[in-house]
């Protein structure tokens, strides 16, 4: 036993010695992050919002601004109301603060009921009832209980007062002009839609889409663009339950609480004005900054041309140029060519700084080569725009003369 134990000790010592003399294991190399430089913020079609401000600083009128960004269009008129889905209200019904003269309209019959007053009643609610019906209930602040007031076979809406306070799931109150309608979109719960005049709607849009401190001509241009955008989508949503959402997927809308004196003035100064092409409302797209050139679209009034106003001095544009980094793993996942060896822009528009907006991007990796559109890269890497370059890559080619095959 003793000899075996000694032998085991000797063998163990030899292994330790051999291990100590072996070369240390080299840490696996980590692929570096990818640096991406760019210009602008958004798709670049239609009006640059910072460009409109730059043009206003340069002394251009609202008409000159709109003529530049929507060439070939004419001024028209529009009135009426708009239906906006309120995304922040994720409850099963529509809950509002109780105020005098608040009413409920039965949308099936058109009849309006004035809600009763009560000293301790401080909330009203429209909730689902039966098959596609609604019920209206009140909340008593003293007893802390809900009491059923009336049932309806169809949808209903609160109306009758200048401003109604919508109670959100967080308990916060957001005020809206017009009516607050309950609609059944999914069959599972009721969504909230604000039915409001077009002009009052714009009062809640313009200060959310532009800075209220901007020059009057820039704010007026934003008002006309937003009004036109609304009317265009309204004309295509007649059979739907709402016309627009209230987020960046449509136009940002904050209701009454977002209104500012300067933007209300801009809306009033352009009351009813929209832009037409061949007698019809245009797709009045706009984005924060086009980087120095407008982007071409699928309609005649969305053209590719240089824009000297986007980076105009004192416009305050923070996205004239920008630089970001993305982890190597994230970039590799986008292109799916293994370890990235090179990234380069293959084609550009040829208009604007650095050869213009990128059109296609090539990645060469350990598993091959892949070409994506610049918009695909923008979306998948969460970039501010598709006007991009890869400054650390010696293979980046800004020339508009290089095609998708690299020739």
Residue ranges and their predicted role:
Residues 2-407:
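Conserved, single-site charged/polar hotspot
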């Amino acid at each position: 036993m003793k000899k075996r134990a000694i032998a085991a000790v000797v063998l163990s010592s030899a292994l330790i010695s051999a291990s100590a003399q072996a070369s240390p294991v080299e840490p696996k190399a980590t692929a570096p992050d990818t640096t991406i430089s760019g210009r602008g913020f958004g798709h670049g079609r239609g009006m640059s919002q910072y460009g409109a401000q730059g043009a206003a600083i340069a002394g251009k009128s609202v008409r000159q601004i709109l003529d530049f960004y929507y060439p070939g269009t004419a001024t028209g008129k529009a009135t009426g109301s708009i239906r906006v889905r309120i995304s922040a209200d994720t409850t099963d019904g529509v809950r509002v603060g109780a105020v005098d003269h608040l009413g409920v309209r039965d949308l099936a019959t058109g009849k309006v009921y004035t809600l009763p007053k009560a000293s301790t009643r401080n909330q009203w609610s429209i909730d689902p009832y039966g098959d596609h019906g609604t019920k209206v209930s009140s909340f008593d602040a003293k007893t802390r209980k809900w009491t059923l007031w009336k049932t309806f076979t169809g949808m209903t809406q609160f109306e009758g007062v200048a401003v109604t306070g919508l109670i959100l799931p967080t308990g916060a109150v957001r005020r809206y002009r017009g009516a607050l309608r309950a609609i059944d979109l999914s069959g599972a719960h009721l969504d909230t839609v604000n039915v409001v005049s077009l002009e009052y709607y714009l009062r809640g849009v313009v200060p959310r889409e532009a800075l209220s401190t901007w020059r009057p001509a820039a704010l007026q241009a934003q008002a006309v663009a937003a009004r036109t955008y609304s009317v265009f989508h309204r004309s295509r949503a007649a059979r739907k339950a709402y016309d627009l959402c209230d987020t960046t997927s449509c136009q940002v809308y904050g209701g009454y609480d977002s209104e500012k004196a300067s933007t209300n003035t801009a809306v009033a100064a352009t009351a009813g004005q929209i832009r037409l092409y061949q007698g019809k409302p245009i797709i009045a797209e706009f984005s924060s900054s086009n980087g120095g050139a407008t982007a071409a679209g699928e309609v005649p009034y969305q053209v590719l041309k240089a824009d000297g106003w986007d980076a105009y001095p004192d416009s305050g544009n923070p996205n004239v140029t920008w630089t970001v980094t993305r982890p190597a793993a994230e970039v590799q996942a986008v292109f799916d060519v293994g370890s990235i060896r090179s990234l380069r822009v293959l084609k550009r528009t040829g208009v604007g700084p650095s050869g213009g907006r990128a059109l296609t991007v090539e990645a060469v990796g350990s598993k091959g080569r892949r070409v994506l559109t610049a918009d695909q890269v923008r979306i998948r890497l969460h970039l501010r725009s598709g006007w991009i370059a890869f400054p650390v890559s010696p293979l980046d080619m800004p020339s508009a003369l290089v095609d998708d095959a690299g020739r």
